[in-house]
Amino acid sequence: FVKDGVTLTIEAGTEILGRYDANYSADNPAPCLVVEQGGKVMAQGTADAPITFRSELSEDDPNYGNGRGLWGGLIINGYAPIANEGGTAAVEGLTGVLYGGSDPDDNSGVLRYVRVWNGGSSIAPDNEINGITLAGVGRGTTVEYCEVALNLDDGFEMFGGTVDLKYCSAVSVGDDAFDTDAGYQGRGQFLLVVRADDSDKGHEMDSKTNGDLDSQPRSHPHFANVTVISSVAHGEDALRLREGTGGDFRNYIIHGANDGVRNDDNGSEVVTQDLAEAAAAGHPDFLYVSGSMVMNGLGGDPWDDFDEATDGTWTGTYVMESAGLSYTVDANGLPATLDVTPSADGSAYEGVDDVIEDDFFVPTYYKGAFGSANWLEGWSYLDEAGLLFEQEEAVTLLGGNLTEDTYLAASGTYYLNQQLFVKDGVTLTIEAGTEILG
């Protein structure tokens, strides 16, 4: 337990092993790292030297099994607002550890290039530990280039708070990949979900507190550039929105799965695919899902039992054309091969949504979590396990606003997939012999 006023600093490249016990319970709790309110963790790894939390067991140990639930996880608690009377609540998986407050800018530290594998031990029926739990964590906290793989319960779960996530992945977790609840109002961009055949949903997003579908603050995640990959044999919805959650979802690619997006148990929020209508409803009382969302390779319904019974105008628009991703599973339903980078001539580069203009979101010219570059390379579980498709030749995609001096070498491969604007004061230099494809 990192107590109030204490900072735990973890050096890049550090590996922390979790003790294994086949009989974890409430009386024999699984080991986990808990940052209490007012404490901080400074875990700043790099792509070449990530910080890794994993089980002490190796894959050839007879107790390793499918690699899930072998120890606890990482639990961070902050003072940011949550939807609960009194402003605080006890965190899931522990006894008597509180989260929540009134400071949306609360700072619990830094998680950068942090990998959490093999966690999620069950300590009681329906009481498991998530890979990374962010409970009442504020936006002053940095969470980027983080990964949860082979967790028994959820990958990332946010209970209220305002913390933002960028460049994060959840791989082969037993429950939901990104789970939000209790008034979470953070932002996320460049998020990847890779579901094994027995994983649950890519997102499960709730808001209801004490039976009230309109409890405040209403959960209202703003997520953009998200890729959710699974096989068509997967029986669960890719995204599940329910219990009064609002939100803003743009530039998504859903590849595979049975059904796409399900929404039920609305509160009084407006459900719409029209940004003007969402703006008129006002934050956080709308649920906006972009009509440019790519849903390809589904076995069932793109909008599964989608509840649109509000004052909003719901059109059920989506894009069916392939983004050029590929994914196979092995005999156990676990990832075997994976190509997360979309085709330059596919649907990922057509009808791209503008992201919200603020200090967090990065303007992109593609949908999904990846353009031509793969930010998983060099540090992810998927890369280390040899599951990522190796590109023979990197393609640089050109489009949007060029805001800094740029040099295009003749040795590169370039694809102009939209208008490219060289802005005032910027110089674009193109080497002799360069070929740019349109």
List the predicted regions and their residue ranges:
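Catalytic domains of riboflavin
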Residues: 13
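Extracellular beta-rich repeat passengers
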Residues: 1-3, 19-40, 44-46, 50-153, ...
